[in-house]
Curated annotation (Swiss-Prot):
Record organism: Oryctolagus cuniculus (Rabbit)
Disulphides: C27-C86
Key words of the record: Disulfide bond, Immunoglobulin domain
Name of one Pfam family that matches: C1-set
Note: This lambda chain expresses the c7 allotypic specificity.
Protein name: Ig lambda chain C region
Domain Ig-like as annotated: residue spans: 6-100
Listed PROSITE patterns: IG_LIKE
């Protein structure tokens, strides 16, 4: 089975959650093969390791894999950044998706 680069979607925190001073970003990684994938979160270009929770890849019905990565921030942290990026590395290929908090409020 040939290698397949993942599709990456980055979801912003919900407005409901922000009211509670919480901000969870969800990076959805799907349709990749083989199953080994590395996720790196960046805020304003700097690597973030605190508050990161990444699932083990699971097999989809099409025999490719999917995983999710969550970044837990406070609403104030989220609003203080210019941009937040989910960087996914798979088989030497890197896919990046970014959000600008100012555009998501």
């Amino acid at each position: 089975q040939p290698a397949v680069t993942p599709s990456v979607i980055l979801f912003p925190p919900s407005s409901e959650e922000l009211k509670d001073n919480k901000a969870t970003l969800v990076c959805l990684i799907s349709d990749f093969y083989p199953r080994t994938v590395k996720v790196n979160w960046k805020a304003d270009g700097n690597s973030v390791t605190q508050g990161v929770d990444t699932t083990q890849p699971s097999k989809q019905s099409n025999n490719k894999y999917a995983a999710s990565s969550f970044l837990h921030l406070t609403a104030n942290q989220w609003k203080s950044y210019q941009s937040v990026t989910c960087q996914v590395t798979h088989e030497g290929h890197t896919v990046e998706k970014s959000l600008a908090p100012a555009e998501c409020s």
